[in-house]
Amino acid sequence: MDVKSIISQMTLEEKAALCSGKDFWHLDTPQRLGIESVMVSDGPCGIRKQSDAADHLGLNASVPATSYPTGSCMACSFDRELFRRSGEVLGHACQAEDLSVLLGPAINIKRSPLGGRNFEYLSEDPYLTGELAKNYINGVQSQNVGVSVKHFAANSQEYNRMSSDSVVDERTLREIYLSAFETAVKDSKPWTIMCSYNRINGTFAAENKRLLTDILRDEWGFDGYVMSDWGATTADRVKCLEAGMELEMPGKNAANDKQIVDAVNNGTLDIKVLDTAVERILNIVLKYTENKQPETKIDFEADHEEARKIADESMVLLKNDGILPLKRSQKLAFIGKFAETPRFQGGGSSHVNSYKVTSALEAAKGLDVTYAPGYDTNTTESDEALLKEAQEAAKNADVAVVFVGITDAMESEGMDRRTLSMPKNHEALVKAVSEVQKNTVVVVMCGGCITMPWIDAVRGVLYAYLGGEAVGTATLDLLFGDVNPSGKLAETFPRRLEDNPSYLYFFGDEQNKTEYREGVFVGYRYYDKKNMDVLFPFGYGLSYTTFEYSNLTLDKSKMKDTDTLTVSVNVRNTGKVKGKEVVQLYVGMPESHTIRPVKELRGFEKVELEPGEEKTVTFTLAKRAFAYYRTDISDWYVESGDYTIMAAKSSRDIACTATVNVTSTTQIKRVYTMNSTIEEIMESPVGREILGKMMAQNPLAQADADDIGMGEAMARMMAEMPLRALLSFGGDSVPAGAGEMLLKQLNA
């Protein structure tokens, strides 16, 4: 069907109606013109199609669906193909349920470990987030189902999320909070984007023309439609439309539709703006309806197995002093309510009515396993009787496996966490069991990171995150070594909450402003810059085998920023079992003239190796791998100089390094003023010549610095002195207008 022809036949009221939902999940299409209504649905880790009572917080029933591991779990796979595959099976399920757009992926950056929706988000690192997200998008959209990449932008907290103001400087916004969205838009062309609730530097996302039009469309080339998060549209519907927010959800808000109609009729809204919005929405509607696959069926058993495989690749082994893998001949104690009733998904809009859930206790049928609940999930207080029962079970076992984590009541959409500690009764259980059983392994089920005051008292820790409906089976796959753990942390685990760079400002001020004062130093970027000890670093994860890196090679030692650099490194499995290693590539500039992180992730690859096998892993680095965002030129800029290329097992375990010299091809014309320093002016040949003569007559420059005991300090003071100050010290020896003459020559 021809979209422009359809628009020409639509009434003004029909156009306005299309720009808001028909109900909670459907679009209000002009059905009299043969355009059927389409449905959108949550969520990133399993579809949440509601047929009856609808809501956006997971309160009412939805159709049965497969619950896959959450974003925080899946991201630890560091596996692009896994993300593409997971998107593909979700897109297939959407076709079967007649859903035109899946509301995900959620790719906000984990600014703080307190973030209430961190379980949905992928990482603290924008490069990792963008790479995984674009593959997920490709997978979903390969099934002719759209995605809605969310929440655009700088939406890293739940506290006052509908009104908070994220105050972020431009460089930080570009490098950290917009970067993953940019990758997703440019590389995968998502059908839709969902704008967030919050304000960004004073302007609500739904009204933010600079974000929704200037950056998203004009810079990045986005050609789909932008929908609001549910209830994110402001009182000024016309302003939102003019900013580039086409679809208001949910519907039906007759008053807002009337705003649009009235604005067109009284001439305050150009009909072309409305027609453009309608065209963008119809393009996506028809892309789905004209290529629907109504014969598609869901194979729930196959999808359940897929959920298990994803969890197998994603869970992270954090500690193992030889206790793992377990043996099926051992007498085991499974302790903790989560062994019987696992926590496998988050609360809120991503909550799925799971097809079936397999617990660890159920998966262990046929083995010699004693179970003790250990705690009551409806309270945080310990029960002495439950603790004693747990200790008895532990004492009579060869190995005690304790299942603990964070409860639904502490971690959900709509609220942020207030602590990194587990509930008191979970902490007490680990302590009680480890006191009577030296062979204690802890399995943690939660959406984000926690502190571990008991870490030295146990022999093993498996971090299951929220592992989806097959979490129990996958947990046993890893505990028994049927699958070799290969997950790596996609976020840093700090030792204390207070160590996090956003700690002082996370919940905002009395004006509801949340200042991102840490700038680009989010996650490992901060901990590395501070050289701060952490509990577990970004990119960390153990295996049942070992890997050795060697022969890091660059295809050139010098390059321009317009060139590409090919990097290769050899990886050998030096252990006795097959395993997968995530090779991480970081780039840093030790002698940078600007404030930059020590290193930043710029590549990763997951490689499988048999015992004794060696493979060469190759990466290609282009301009952005070396660049930072310069606000004075409003563009990405590569500073000339030496860069260190690091092949690593984690952000703190660097295996090999090499150096490449990069020359910038961007010429930046410096504008000199009376406030320019002597050091800055001396960088110019003209400045060196003229200032040399002026300083020869300056009493400060003539002084013998060593005689007055200042030495290097005197030289530093002179270097940092502004031109206006130097001229004032010159007295009569400096001719009138000398400064203006110098500036004219410098700026010529």
Please provide the spans of the model-predicted regions:
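Low-complexity, Pro/Ser/Thr- and charge-rich linker/hinge segments at domain boundaries
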Residues: 663-683
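Globin-like tetrapyrrole-binding proteins
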Residues: 745-747
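Terminal connector regions
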Residues: 623-667
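Glycoside hydrolase catalytic-domain context in secreted enzymes
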Residues: 1-628, 642-646, 651
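Conserved, compact domain cores that house catalytic/ligand-binding motifs in diverse enzymes
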Residues: 676-740
